[in-house]
């Protein structure tokens, strides 16, 4: 018997909801954003740039935002007791991060880079281009921290330095450790589309995957690669996942028990986020590999999950509606892709 989805409860605005209202920038809701590089943004006083929140799936533990740094500009210095993982959706720039002036580290990045801000470190993002803006897609644990402490002084003006999470000097960029299959610890990945992933044969032929602990965060993330003609099984989990397409094309199918399936096309720059316990499956319809970058759950280094019941979290292909597979095969044929479909048990 499958675990039913949880009912929505509303006891009024949470501390995080109130923070979003106070920030005064647009808030995008729903499940899917077509392209983060074209979203309408607003003036963000705290950051000193343009931005919008992506409060997809009404998340209250993790969330995301998009910020745009104009040419020859920079963000205001930021410091906060919540974690951030940054994906560079557009442009080239640099980030300075420090706990004190002696420990300041500056590194450059370009499209497709991912990195984390060490907890409660001060940082500034820079745009060195005189003509092109930068867009950053950022996942955060802000909702959980604000909802627990509901005190902005503690979150944004806390002097404590987490020295165990900060690699000073050259060590910040030198720190790279391939811990085991499909798991890497580092502070910066220059380009998720060119970073070598490990084979994941139990997920499907030619499927590749890598989980990361970035910047010693507890916030989890991973990159998955689906070859042509490849799709995932339908799976579900708790709220908080945000997924951005970094390479290729296809679609995602979303639904909850008792509701109709929704199909959403995706391309590079599309972001989607399933609701709590919402079934979802990823489908590659292109002639090349499809990669996505997902932020959700705990990082491998600090995961405290100890139990999982696959019967509650995945639908074997033999048990799904046959129309799903037939539709996929027909789309592949129209696109000139071999219809020998590989199914990824995700």
Q: What label would you give each PLM region?
A:
Residues 1-60, 151-218, 222, 322-346:
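A short, N-terminal "cap"/entry segment at the start of jelly-roll beta-barrel domains
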Residues 46-52, 63-80, 205, 222-237:
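Conserved short histidine dyad/triad with adjacent acidic residue
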Residues 53-56, 74-80, 97, 106-107, ...:
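Short histidine-centered beta-strand/loop micro-motifs
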Residues 64-69, 126-128, 221-225, 231-232, ...:
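A structural feature that tracks compact, well-ordered secondary-structure segments
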Residues 70-71, 80-100, 227-228, 237-257:
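Glycine- and acidic-residue-biased ligand/ion/polar-headgroup-sensing regions
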Residues 74-76, 94-95, 113-125, 231-232, ...:
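Histidine-centered metal-chelating micro-motifs
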Residues 85-87, 116, 131-150, 243-244, ...:
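A short hydrophobic beta-strand segment most commonly corresponding to one strand
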Residues 99-118, 256-276:
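Short acidic-glycine-tyrosine-enriched beta hairpin
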